[in-house]
């Protein structure tokens, strides 16, 4: 899977811009084949789009590279990461402050996995290790309450997942979008301010498969990784991820 390179933020000057906040990076062997998390997030937003997506700006917040203002871009995406939102590293605390500012300024925020967790934490929720342990591979989540701009979702959504932390306490004002027995707060909507998913709509099945194969028996428990791998079928984004991509473009456009 190839992805266009995402230029550094200072190189992008557009009337409408989407800032992607890079909070982690895949292993080089994976990135060389599938792109990095910024490219995956941009690929999700562009998937199935009838017109070209506005250019996006990369901010490597994991390296301390932050925008000078939460209004620097018209919308924000927070990527996944191998880090835990519970670490409270200085860059994470700075990111939490930026996300609060973005929400207050009316700049839409999209959180993906780690982004889901750090956004919830920033807005008054709680993130903890999940009592259910690692969740790996394609997971099904029951849709509870979808806003109008998420029209098209079925009663369940299937997304790739890889996490062992979860949002244990939902922030004030957040609405539950999707849930599962193993992940009660799987997706949240914050009015028109933000939306987040514990799963990875931006991960292709090919990337998830390679990720599980690389880390199974090492970082990831061999039994769960093996079960997830055995159940993986097909390639590309899941059908529900494509529906979500269309909805996220509406979410940004209607800000």
Q: Where are the model-predicted features located?
A:
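N-terminal beta1-alpha1 cap of cysteine-dependent amidohydrolase-like domains
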Residues: 1-97, 101-105, 226-255
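Hydrophobic/aromatic beta-strand patches that form the interior of the parallel beta-sheet core
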Residues: 19-21, 57-59, 77, 110, ...
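Short glycine-/acidic-enriched loop or helix-start segments at secondary-structure transitions
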Residues: 30-31, 87-89, 120-122, 171, ...
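Glycine-rich, phosphate-binding/catalytic loops in enzymes
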Residues: 36-38, 92-96, 127-128, 178, ...
